[in-house]
């Protein structure tokens, strides 16, 4: 998920840009796209004051290929970043391919990036600051180091925007969450009883029960039957899945 804000400054012709990137965010929980109840009031406020994209797709349903496509404007078969593998299998983006950061920098912008990278070189041109983990606890849901890093990312971005440079800038605040829902599955693998939470459990989607697996696309069959996270959830009941959805939405 991504939100783009433009902050025009009267003293300069070039506007400033803030890009907020949320890993694994689905529009099905975003109020601006009709989710009821909405899990994203701040995003909804931004959307109400600007433009929303109603028909947008990622370049690939994997982190590194998708991010390389986003920051370069090219599809994975053009960037050659095709998986989440290490560099000896998955080469980084060639220097010959322009990136969003290199184009903005070449045109007089300060390009800064805070937070998650996982970009295979596609953030070239941005000055990156690694976030510092800020531990916290949640009384109802497990949290880990990736979530702690998001606190540091937010604080770094706010500090930068509170004291912006004189030249025009493009700033990216790149968050780990809600991708950490993958870790929730591992924390609750197998048969288990979930602890009660303070809010009502959400209902499961209408397509939760699959009547005919053979009618589903092969990639979906693979994810549902072979992926390690689905193996960890193989013995979950419907109540476990409702807690899982609640964890994602919170």
Q: Language model features by range: what are they?
A:
Residues 16, 38, 42-45, 99, ...:
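Extracytoplasmic/secreted proteins, especially bacterial periplasmic and envelope-associated proteins
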Residues 69-171, 175-197:
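Catalytic-site neighborhoods of secreted/periplasmic enzymes
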Residues 22, 30, 43-48, 71, ...:
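Non-transmembrane alpha-helical segments in soluble domains
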Residues 24-33, 37, 163-167, 175-250:
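Active-site-proximal cap/lid insertion segments
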């Amino acid at each position: 998920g991504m939100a783009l804000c433009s902050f025009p400054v009267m003293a300069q012709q070039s506007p400033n840009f803030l890009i907020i990137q949320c890993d694994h965010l689905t529009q099905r929980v975003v109020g601006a796209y009709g989710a009821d109840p909405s899990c994203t009031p701040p995003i909804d406020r931004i959307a109400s004051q600007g433009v929303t994209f109603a028909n947008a797709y990622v370049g690939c349903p994997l982190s590194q290929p998708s991010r390389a496509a986003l920051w370069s404007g090219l599809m994975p078969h053009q960037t050659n970043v095709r998986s989440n593998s290490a560099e000896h299998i998955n080469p980084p983006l060639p220097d010959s391919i322009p990136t969003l950061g290199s184009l903005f920098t070449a045109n007089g912008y300060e390009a800064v990036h805070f937070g998650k990278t996982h970009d295979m070189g596609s953030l070239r041109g941005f000055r990156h600051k690694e976030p510092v983990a800020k531990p916290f606890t949640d009384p109802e849901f497990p949290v880990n180091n990736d979530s702690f890093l998001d606190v540091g990312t937010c604080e770094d971005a706010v500090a930068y925007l509170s004291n912006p440079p004189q030249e025009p800038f493009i700033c990216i605040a790149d968050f780990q969450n809600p991708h950490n829902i993958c870790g929730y599955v591992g924390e609750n693998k197998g048969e288990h009883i979930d602890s009660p939470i303070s809010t009502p459990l959400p209902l499961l989607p209408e397509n939760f029960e699959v009547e005919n697996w053979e009618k589903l696309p092969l990639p979906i069959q693979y994810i549902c039957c072979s992926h390690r996270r689905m193996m960890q959830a193989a013995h979950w009941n419907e109540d476990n899945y409702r807690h899982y959805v609640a964890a994602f939405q919170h």
